[in-house]
From Swiss-Prot:
Transferase among keywords: yes
UniProt family annotation: Belongs to the AdoMet synthase family.
Function summary: Catalyzes the formation of S-adenosylmethionine from methionine and ATP. The reaction comprises two steps that are both catalyzed by the same enzyme: formation of S-adenosylmethionine (AdoMet) and triphosphate, and subsequent hydrolysis of the triphosphate.
Name of this chain's protein: S-adenosylmethionine synthase
Cross-referenced CDD domains: S-AdoMet_synt (cd18079)
Lineage of source species: Eukaryota, Viridiplantae, Streptophyta, Embryophyta, Tracheophyta
Domain of life: Eukaryota
Binding residue positions for L-methionine: E56, Q99, D246, K277
Cofactor(s) the protein needs: Mn(2+); Mg(2+); Co(2+); K(+)
Designated gene of the protein: SAMS
Record keywords, A-Z: ATP-binding, Cobalt, Cytoplasm, Magnesium, Metal-binding, Nucleotide-binding, One-carbon metabolism, Potassium, Transferase
A Pfam family recorded for this sequence: S-AdoMet_synt_N
EC code: 2.5.1.6
């Protein structure tokens, strides 16, 4: 059996880039909670003892930007200079302007357009991906790297590993084989964890704790063997971290946010953007489409692309590729996708309820991935169900003599109470 290796990485919530993503999305949450029609394009950057929030925001909400910054930093664990940033003492700079009137008139007509008329906030192309290799319909390499990062944070905050500090990175290499276009995991080849720590712990203690409290609870035993390689804090020292160790900026972890290098990426970041920004809403709807295709058994693996022009509601293109794993031709799957998913930005917003802020809804997306999460706030993860009735009908027609076909079809029409249901393969409701 010929196999290949594929690697995905992740970073946890204390990484400076992820800190910025979380602040940007915390601002978005605050705006949408008070004013669902807020137009938000919020960026954040950070370096030693400083956080800056900047961008374009048009909202009726009364937002205390400095408080959001400090609360977000504190909740992550940046509570002293020793760990890389002190939430209560750092400088907070704010430079927010209104959305450009040129953009406003073209996209939403200064709030006068109906939802179906709202145009895309910018040009661009977005990708959604799904695979049947995990229950989350996500790539295993990405799932494991992401869960390791989340587990690092969990054992830091619950005191299991008190020597841990907020910053950290993970990486997992999985050995796969190709099963007629589908990807089947065989084993975990390599696990890499680099985590910030205090001065009190030895490298041997770090390695032992990471294996026992982080790796073992996350990676299923069936994927680990005597050949699995572990690189645990291979640099030998990681005391200086967070914004003290590296500058951070919103939107620099877009592969970690999505599929860990699988599928494709259009280049647009998500955090700090309201749903008129198709970088975010477009990526969410094509994830739902791709996941629905795989979850309904139409394919084992699928990528969906959508593209937009600024100010134009209808997408310029929609594309589907099942990598040869489709149960029916890709052109038929594309037809089903177009019939069941509305790719206009205003309608995506309604169908996925993307104007709803609060409850840290978008803040939750800003660490540990936007996809594959079991959370009711992640509405784009809801699979549109399939009936599959016409596929069964096709099988009956093949095996039953022609003289009975009209009778069978008539009976089925009465049972289904709709001739249309018989015509459409795998119709998603």
């Amino acid at each position: 059996m010929e196999t290949f290796l594929f690697t995905s990485e992740s970073v946890n919530e204390g990484h400076p880039d992820k800190l910025c993503d979380q602040i940007s999305d915390a601002v978005l949450d605050a705006c949408l909670a008070q004013d669902p029609d807020s137009k938000v394009a919020c960026e954040t950057c950070t370096k030693t003892n400083m956080v800056m929030v900047f961008g374009e925001i048009t909202t009726k909400a009364d937002v205390d930007y400095e408080k959001i910054v400090r609360d977000t930093c504190r909740s992550i664990g940046f509570v002293s200079d020793d760990v890389g940033l002190d939430a209560d003492k750092c400088k907070v700079l704010v430079n927010i302007e209104q959305q450009s009137p040129d953009i406003a008139q073209g996209v939403h007509g200064h709030f006068t357009k109906r939802p179906e008329e709202i145009g895309a906030g910018d040009q661009g192309h977005m990708f959604g991906y799904a695979t049947d290799e995990t229950p989350e319909f996500m790539p295993l390499s990405h799932v494991l790297a992401t869960k390791l990062g989340a587990r690092l944070t969990e054992v830091r905050k619950n005191g299991t590993c008190p020597w841990l500090r907020p910053d950290g990175k993970t990486q997992v290499t999985v050995e796969y084989y190709n099963e007629n276009g589908a990807r089947v995991p065989v084993r975990v080849h390599t696990v890499l964890i680099s985590t910030q720590h205090d001065e009190t712990v030895t490298n041997d203690e770090i390695a032992a704790d990471l294996k026992e409290h982080v790796i073992k609870p996350v990676i299923p035993e069936k994927y680990l063997d005597e050949k699995t390689i572990f690189h645990l804090n291979p640099s030998g020292r990681f005391v200086i971290g967070g914004p003290h160790g590296d500058a951070g900026l919103t939107g620099r972890k877009i592969i970690i946010d999505t599929y860990g290098g699988w599928g494709a990426h259009g280049g647009g970041a998500f955090s700090g953007k309201d749903p008129t920004k198709v970088d975010r809403s477009g990526a969410y709807i094509v994830r739902q489409a791709a996941k629905s295709i795989v979850a309904n058994g139409l394919a084992r693996r699928c990528i969906v692309q959508v593209s937009y022009a600024i100010g134009v509601p209808e997408p310029l293109s929609v594309y589907v590729d099942t990598y040869g794993t489709g149960k029916i031709p890709d052109k038929e799957i594309l037809k089903i996708v177009k019939e069941n998913f509305d790719f206009r930005p205003g309608m995506i917003t309604i169908n996925l309820d993307l104007k709803r802020g609060g409850n840290s809804r978008f803040l939750k997306t800003a660490a540990y991935g936007h996809f594959g999460r079991d959370d009711p706030d992640f509405t784009w993860e809801v699979v549109k169900p399939s009936s599959g009735r016409s596929l069964n009908l096709k099988v009956l027609v093949v095996i039953i003599p022609a003289c009975f076909i009209e009778l069978i079809i008539g009976c089925l029409m009465l049972m289904l109470n709709s001739p249309y249901s018989i015509e459409v393969s795998y119709m998603m409701i």
